[in-house]
Amino acid sequence: SVSLEQTLGFRIKVTNVLDVVTEGRLYSFNSSNNTLTIQTTKKNQSPQNFKVIKCTFIKHLEVIGDKPSFNSFKKQQIKPSYVNVERVEKLLKESVIASKKKELLRGKGVSAEGQFIFDQIFKTIGDTKWVAKDIIILDDVKVQPPYKVEDIKVLHEGSNQSITLIQRIVERSWEQLEQDDGRKGG
Amino acid sequence: MTTTSTTSVDGRTSSTLKATLSASGPNSNGPTPAVLPQKPKLTGWAQAAAKALPRQQQQQQQARKDDSVAVQPANTKTKTIASTAPPANIKGSSTANGSSTNKKFKRANKQPYNREEVRSYMHKLFQSYTAGEKSHSMKTYKQVLSETASGRVSTATDWGTVSSSKNKNKKYGCLSDIAKVLRNQ
Amino acid sequence: MKGNFRKRDSSTNSRKGGNSDSNYTNGGVPNQNNSSMFYENPEITRNFDDRQDYLLANSIGSDVTVTVTSGVKYTGLLVSCNLESTNGIDVVLRFPRVADSGVSDSVDDLAKTLGETLLIHGEDVAELELKNIDLSLDEKWENSKAQETTPARTNIEKERVNGESNEVTKFRTDVDISGSGREIKERKLEKWTPEEGAEHFDINKGKALEDDSASWDQFAVNEKKFGVKSTFDEHLYTTKINKDDPNYSKRLQEAERIAKEIESQGTSGNIHIAEDRGIIIDDSGLDEEDLYSGVDRRGDELLAALKSNSKPNSNKGNRYVPPTLRQQPHHMDPAIISSSNSNKNENAVSTDTSTPAAAGAPEGKPPQKTSKNKKSLSSKEAQIEELKKFSEKFKVPYDIPKDMLEVLKRSSSTLKSNSSLPPKPISKTPSAKTVSPTTQISAGKSESRRSGSNISQGQSSTGHTTRSSTSLRRRNHGSFFGAKNPHTNDAKRVLFGKSFNMFIKSKEAHDEKKKGDDASENMEPFFIEKPYFTAPTWLNTIEESYKTFFPDEDTAIQEAQTRFQQRQLNSMGNAVPGMNPAMGMNMGGMMGFPMGGPSASPNPMMNGFAAGSMGMYMPFQPQPMFYHPSMPQMMPVMGSNGAEEGGGNISPHVPAGFMAAGPGAPMGAFGYPGGIPFQGMMGSGPSGMPANGSAMHSHGHSRNYHQTSHHGHHNSSTSGHK
Amino acid sequence: MAIKSLESFLFERGLVGSYAIEALNNCTLDIDVNHYVSRLLTNKREQYLDAIGGFPTSLKMYLESDLKIFKDFNITPIFVFNGGLTYNQLEASGHFTAASASASISSTTTSSSGTNATTRSNTESVLLQRSRGWTQWNNLISSNQNSYIDQPIQPQEPFRHNTTIDSKAYQNDLIAYFIEHGYMYQVAPYSSWFQLAYLLNSAYIDAIYGPTDCLMLDCVDRFILGMEFPNKEFRFIDRSRVMKDLGCTHEEFIDIAMAVGNDLQPTTLPPLQIYPVPQLFDIALEMVLNTGTNFYAYQLSTTLQNDSKENIQNYQRGISALRYMPVLKDTGKVELFVQEIVVSEEDSEKNNKDGKKSNLSSPSSASSSASPATTVTKNASEKLTYEKSSTKEVRKPRDIPNDVHDFIGQMLPHEYYFYRSIGLVTGKLFDAIVTGVYPEEPPLGGGSSTSYKKLVSKSVEIFKNKEINLLTQPINRYYQIKQIKQVKWYAANEPTTLTNRMSPSMFETINHLIVKTETSDEKEFSISEFITTINGSSNMAKDFISEKVIFPNSVPIESKLNSPFNLLSTNFLRLLVLLEFFTFDFKEKLLEPTRWGEVFLKLNELNIDSKYHESVIIFLVFLKCDVLKLDEEVQPPAPSALSQATLRSYPEESLYVLLITRVLTLFQVDQKPSNYHGPIDKKTLIFRDHLSFIKENLNELFEAVLISSLTSGEFNRLSLDNFGWARKIVRYLPFKLDSPNTIMAMMWEFFLQKYLHNGNAKNDALSLVATEFNTYKSTPNLDEQFVESHRFLLEISKVMQELNAAKLIDENVFKLFTKAVEFTTTALSS
């Protein structure tokens, strides 16, 4: 039998039970949690992509190409090195804050179309937010599900300017959605 | 008494040393016009010093060098003057001293992976989430599943891959193709 | 070496120690190997776990996608994961959303139920996709921190140095410098050695050139360029000096003198020194794979450079001479005879510093006495000289970035002249006595040909002989050697003792030349050629690789095809003398046999090998087939069919040679009268599919000839009755 | 290696002619030793050789009888050995990985290793069979554990099967034999059969006896394939007749040869690798004739397959090696043997280009080779004659590409090839310099013991670095920079880089040491004479340290080393300095023996028989390396050949037996040639591996020292012709011959065991040895051999005493050994 270490660096093609195929280099095989980690980007690329796959989820694993010449821990070009825990903590905090901001722009439990309409409006008008499942623009205009042109409501009187703009945006967005749909169908 | 001389230390005149230091900018790694002409000189000097030594002495030193295990590796190439950091700094505290040490190390060797520290941090982090589930409006996937329609239909987590395929009961079953290649090399 | 071994030992020990210290358990999974494929020890497990932990720790705070076992994909911010879980990885996502609803539900349905934070247990995590993970964050972070703190430190250092300026004459140890006030363990300096692998090369990536020049590393350069660690350079960084040595000051003076000498050299015209002083070699020729594996493609260039350098060249000045062979006259003559223009008593004096003029002077001139006037150099100077010479001669053509050209104006011109190799002589043999190999070979050939005609063949073979199972043992009468019988010749033996001996042979050649020379007094003494004259490459006549002598795929296939057709043509003509060769081709195309799949008949050739694993070549046994008189009558019809199909001698659709099915051997048998059973062969392509050939069926009295063109463009059939 | 399966094919087709041996009367016959040895040692012979080590004695027997017949017919044989290997051959033999892949394959079972008999290389098969032999043996031992008391078990599974014996291993022994009996020999720079072809073409010889590979050369019209001495016949092959019968052109034949596997391209390429070996050629020929297959095109068309790149590469290298093979020419230079090609004059330029682009060997196939048909149709023949009349044919040598070193190997100086050609060097070091790899392959005993591995790693410092420096210093400076690594079979991925460069160089440190005595040219070198010379000096430093170096050309011949004795003595002294048997300091004018050297210098005083001197040095160096004490068990322990009963009842005596057998691995029993089949002992074999390793390394270090001396010009190289070099120098080189086999050690082992169990009855014990070892045939004078080997033990015992006095060995070991020898004395004199 061969040392497990030697599996490192192999270019492999993994088909999971859902027949989704992942290709890349074997980065790690962990028997302690029964997973396989694949590096899916090219060696010299940065940043890198990885995929951790649970072994029980693998239907089939196939080697592509030859045995790598560098199949040992020592020769990997990614080797664990010092991790500054503070830095990790800091990064985590920053990204949580950033994500929170983004999160506000996502409707909870809304349809994909609704989100698309929101995004399109947000592109043009920065002051757009979700209130429950309604889109509120400039605290003036409301778009309710299912977010068609008919669903645009004015909250306060006398803001016709913005309403026409929003109508046009919503209209165009739906056209685009239908086009995309048609393309999908074909 | 044995004196250790390196390329980074020029002991002939203090003025030279000063020049070197003042010349090196805020980032001592950056080259400045004043540094470059200095460099061959040092190289040449050390080269000559090496030659001036009798051969046997060199060999002895070589031997001694091999026997000794250095407390810390030092990168003699850097222009910064080595300040010896207490071992605690290896753990990566953010004091000025510590970071300068790290910096010095950056070129020579990446610092070794701090396994225990990473593990304990990750452990704490995970604890903080799992212990305070409610505070983050935390839901587990199981809960999510039970709330959806499909959840009521029991979902098998085991896809039967292990029991059905030829890799049954084999710990490294999915790696069989790799094993084949390795054996045929 | 010893040190290395010891180091390795200690490192393994410490690793073992580290292992026992760590309280990390394997999560209850027994670490034993159930299958015979792989084995894994705690060491390996730990290494793998470290790899994954390292990756996961670096993925905290990035967006990830989790595929759960039902196929639904969730994306979100990875805020935590459990490294201790034993069945998959427990993952905590912040702001989860459904990216792909998989098979079953609609997104809306699933999304409704999600909260702000989602914990997915390892057993449900089928896949965890980590995207855009930057593993160099720590390094970058350290750098940015360091930059903030450096100025302050530098000032402190400056002050301290000023305070200690009275110690001018002393060398300062590390302890002195770091301040005697602090208590610090003394430590020894260690040479920085690159790790195995590519790290130390990768570090320079993505940085500006200026950064590199400061941190230029001699070891890295040498190792990168030649795969050699220079022993000399190691002293540069590791020398310790013993101040108490009585000869210390004397040596110091000596050292400074030498140092000055070296410094005064400058970089002009010497790419080596230029490189060593921080001028960068362009790395673009090396891709990461090369750096990674440590294989330097420039090895070839190096070889080429050496090749050109080792070629004796009278224009060259000081040649590099191995230290072993110093104090000897060296000669630039490519001939095996080394010649010198100095007399014997002068040889002792002449050193390898003799001027190019002296070395390259033509034979007729009186010897120049330059070398006598020169003082012999001290050994140290000689050594430096040696090194200088070595580095001067040792040039490797590199690509130089444009902005470097200014700096290297002079050296680049030297490079140019170096990279073009001098034309090479086809034969090095200087001797007039030896016959050129060409004539020898042809002479040998014609001789053996003549003798060949006298041999009575043991067996006359016409066309194809069928294979006989018993070997024919028939003795030949007459002579094995033909007309010219060998006779023992003692001279031959003597000749054998003297030939194949480079010393004797080159001496003979030398003496021969001497005889021919009238002014024999001026003749140089004979010396045996020094072994370092031989380059590591063989003499070539053209500047091309052997690989260029091979055809590409199409040409190779076409060649084989032509050959095959030619053979068929010949065998047809041979077998049916009255027939038109054009018919032969069509017949060749027609004489196929119906063939089922590989399972058609038990196959004698299979011998238990898996069928179809490669292109199987399948012989098979057809039913005995008989020759009918009616066949020739059918010929014209078939011929016209062939013509309709555009089949002249050569079909326009020529399949790959080895894919074609053709009769070859059966055609030979076709010429015999009466019914002769014969064996047919059928080829199959690499795919294991039977080749597309023509088929022939027979039903009682009626015959159908069914011909298919190779590509199935056109089918036609005719039937005839007896 | 020959073209796979071709020979049997030719016999079946009746294409092998035969002649009576008289036909060769008075001729000079060149013999390819590789081919010849493979004929003599067929599969059934010497099946247990790998379990006991040593030289195959039966080879000598066959050789002698053949030589006698040559003499009867006044045939002058010239034996040509194979030299270096080309890249394809190196790869196939596992050179670059020190056969580690093969070694690991041999440890797994055949079925799972994924190779079949067709694709497996010879090295793989050898190791596979060896491990099979030992596995079977272990099973046999354990199953007989209870019944075995003092009757040794005979092995059943052969240790060699269906593999060709590597004649390289016995090259030195054969050369020694040829020199002794006055036969001519030569070692080719690369392929031996090319050297034969060159010699034939330049009319130095009349006929060649070589492998079927010779058919690939169109300059060889006929060659002898085999000799059948019982019938006084020989078998030969006539090229034109074969080609006519096969019905393919010369180019197609070469294509087939490359695909089935031959000496220059040993692997069988797809699609042929799935067929059994005996049918390969037959099938390949059918494919060419019936479907117009071109195997090169086939390789190109299957680029998707895993190995296709390597296959294309191997094919190209094979063809190229055939076109440009270095041979040693009569000028003493090694040059490429380039065959000519025929081109028509007017198309010379064009055809040359076309020819270049062809993988087939000649562009004008119609004229250069037999056409497949005997008669040609009228039209076709007219066409041909028309073509012929319009053009003239020109023969010109092929163009030589600029990267011959990529498929042959880098070039060494002519002088180095010369030393190889006369057998002065084995060439393993040359190969290391050329390839950048010095392989440490698994020894006969497997080499799993830690002490052996330790020895391998220690050899880098003690031997290898010095050798590499000595050999790379005098030659092109590329080699001084080139990385040369020691690759070990057990850790092929962790090579040790050898140091080429030292300052001062190794040669500079020793070249002031000169032994120059006033002796005649004829004085023979021996270690004993050397000791006498050294001991004859009252002041070593004065007599053997020369103020001036003697290598420069300016030094007159008289002041150089002028006799073979002085040459060898000088270099032997240098060897001993490098081995630290002497300390030497030129500046201090110091030269004196170390404690080891003192023991060595006493060998004459102690009356040690001069024929054992070499063995004693090996023994001393082994002890000095200090990897295994003489009484120490190897780790992991190997099963003892003694029975459990013996080990349990006689623990003390068992230890004696261990010491005795170990020392006796240095003693070669005087055997009559025979195929050995008798008891085997792995434990002893493993110890023999250690000593054999030391010997090989001593040989290589001495070679390196000698070469550095010769190339620098310290010796008058013009004073000898080839026979002189052989008779006066090569013949007396120490450490050249293969180490003794383990037979004598085992004879003593089983003799003493029987003696112990049988109430100390010597005669029963001796007769047991006689029957078990079949000595009535192989060792008629068994008693004499026991007495002789006992004398050897006593002599070693004297050396041990000196070593003990000098505190160079453990006192316990010394006492134990003394007791052990006493034990043998009582047993033998009882």
Swiss-Prot record, chain B:
Name the residue ranges with Low complexity bias: 1-24, 46-62
Annotated region (Disordered), positions in chain: 1-116, 147-168
Query: What assembly does the database describe for this protein?
Result: Interacts with IGO1, LSM12 and PBP1.
What is the first-listed, main subcellular location in coarse terms?
Answer: cytoplasm
Has the keyword Cytoplasm been applied to this entry?
yes
Sequence intervals crossing the membrane: none
The cellular component terms of Gene Ontology attached to this UniProt record, alphabetical and capped at eight, are: cytoplasm; cytoplasmic stress granule; nucleus; peroxisome
Protein location: Cytoplasm; Nucleus
What name is this protein filed under?
Answer: Protein PBP4
Q: Locate the compositionally biased regions of type Polar residues.
A: 73-83, 91-102, 147-166
Keywords associated with the record: Cytoplasm, Nucleus
Coiled-coil segments: none
Q: What else is known?
A: Present with 1560 molecules/cell in log phase SD medium.
UniProtKB/Swiss-Prot annotation, chain C:
Q: What happens when the gene is disrupted?
A: Abnormal mRNA processing; 3' termini are cleaved but transcripts lack full-length poly(A) tails. Decreases HO mRNA translation.
- Region Disordered, residue ranges: 1-38, 305-380, 412-488, 683-722
Q: Matching InterPro entries, A to Z?
A: ATXN2-like, LsmAD_domain, Sm, SM_dom_ATX
Which Gene Ontology terms cover its molecular function?
A: mRNA binding; protein-containing complex binding
Q: What is the protein name for this chain?
A: PAB1-binding protein 1
Chain positions found as Phosphothreonine: 193
One GO cellular component assignment for this chain's record is: nucleus
Q: How does it assemble?
A: Interacts (via C-terminus) with MKT1 (via C-terminus). Interacts with FIR1, IGO1, LSM12, PBP4 and PAB1.
Q: Where is the composition biased (Basic and acidic residues)?
A: 1-10
Name where it's found: Cytoplasm; Nucleus; Mitochondrion
Q: Which SMART domains match?
A: LsmAD
What family does this belong to? Belongs to the ataxin-2 family.
The Sm domain is annotated at 51-107
Record function comment: Involved in pre-mRNA polyadenylation. May act to repress the ability of PAB1 to negatively regulate polyadenylation. Negative regulator of poly(A) nuclease (PAN) activity. Promotes mating-type switching in mother cells by positively regulating HO mRNA translation. Localizes MKT1 to polysomes.
GO BP annotation list? cellular response to glucose starvation; maintenance of rDNA; negative regulation of TORC1 signaling; positive regulation of translation; regulation of mating type switching; regulation of mitophagy; regulation of translation; stress granule assembly
Which portions of the chain have biased composition (kind: Low complexity)? 307-316, 338-347, 356-370, 412-421, 456-471
> Could you tell me at which residue positions the Glycyl lysine isopeptide (Lys-Gly) (interchain with G-Cter in ubiquitin) crosslink is annotated in this chain?
344
The question of whether rRNA processing is a record keyword is answered with no
What other note does the entry give for this protein?
Present with 2870 molecules/cell in log phase SD medium.
Record bears the keyword Phosphoprotein? yes
Locations of Polar residues compositional bias? 11-38, 429-455
Going by the UniProt record, its keywords in alphabetical order are:
Cytoplasm, Isopeptide bond, Mitochondrion, Nucleus, Phosphoprotein, Ubl conjugation
The PTM Phosphoserine maps to 106, 215, 436
Q: Where is the composition biased (Basic residues)?
A: 698-722
Curated annotation (Swiss-Prot), chain D:
Is Phosphoprotein among the key words of this record?
Answer: yes
What cellular component GO annotations does this protein have?
Answer: cytoplasm; cytoplasmic stress granule; cytosol; nuclear periphery; P-body; ribosome
Here the cross-link named Glycyl lysine isopeptide (Lys-Gly) (interchain with G-Cter in ubiquitin) sits at 4
Q: Which Pfam families match?
A: MKT1_C, MKT1_N, XPG_N
Q: Where are the compositionally biased (Basic and acidic residues) regions?
A: 380-400
Q: What UniProt keywords are attached to this protein's entry?
A: Cytoplasm, Isopeptide bond, Phosphoprotein, Translation regulation, Ubl conjugation
- Gene Ontology molecular function: DNA endonuclease activity; mRNA 3'-UTR binding
Q: Where is this protein chiefly located?
A: cytoplasm
Q: Where is this region: Disordered?
A: 347-400
Q: Which Gene3D superfamilies match?
A: 5'-nuclease (3.40.50.1010)
Bias (Low complexity) ranges: 361-373
Q: What happens when the gene is disrupted?
A: Normal vegetative cell population growth rate and morphology. Decreases expression from the HO locus.
For region Interaction with PBP1, the annotated ranges are 130-380
User: Effect of altering residue 32 to A?
Assistant: Decreases gene expression from the ho locus
Cell compartments where the protein resides = Cytoplasm, Cytosol
* Keyword Cytoplasm attached: yes
Domain of life per record:
Eukaryota
| Residues with Phosphoserine modification | 358, 362, 371
Q: Which InterPro entries match?
A: MKT1_C, MKT1_H3TH, MKT1_N, PIN-like_dom_sf, XPG-I_dom, XPG/Rad2, XPG_DNA_repair_N
**Additional remark text:** Present with 3430 molecules/cell in log phase SD medium.
Q: What interactions and quaternary structure are annotated?
A: Interacts (via C-terminus) with PBP1 (via C-terminus).
Family membership: Belongs to the XPG/RAD2 endonuclease family.
What role is this protein assigned? Involved in 3'-UTR mediated RNA regulation. Binds to RNA-binding and RNA regulatory proteins. Complexes with PAB1-binding protein to promote mRNA interactions with poly(A)-binding protein. Promotes mating-type switching in mother cells by positively regulating HO expression.
Q: What protein is this chain from? A: Post-transcriptional regulator MKT1
- Species in which this protein is naturally found: Saccharomyces cerevisiae (strain ATCC 204508 / S288c) (Baker's yeast)
